[in-house]
């Protein structure tokens, strides 16, 4: 039996870098963010059409992107059922993650 190596996060790797990788290391999530940056606040159905990502898959990614903080949503989770929800890219958080990535790679800029 082959033992898979354990994924190890180096001690000097900040948690924000993991969030950066979760977004920019996934084509679907990158496509969602790109769509929202170009199109502005959008509903799930519009994001699905614009990115060609299936609605169930899109829902999973939107949830994760919201948890990471790169999406702003106009309604809190408890008020969303049966309502149209608009998602928008959080440019400030995206910039924070970009800066964390650059800081990790290049040190003090």
Predicted regions and their residues:
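Beta-hairpin "wing" of winged helix-turn-helix
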Residues: 67-82
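Short, hydrophobic-biased segments on the C-terminal half of alpha helices
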Residues: 62-66
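Short helix-coil-helix linker/hinge
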Residues: 22-29
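Key DNA-contact positions within bacterial/archaeal DNA-binding proteins
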Residues: 56
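A short acidic, leucine-rich amphipathic alpha-helix
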Residues: 46-49
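Short capping segments at the starts of secondary-structure elements
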Residues: 27, 39-43
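Amphipathic alpha-helical dimerization/coiled-coil segments
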Residues: 1-17, 34-38, 81, 86-109
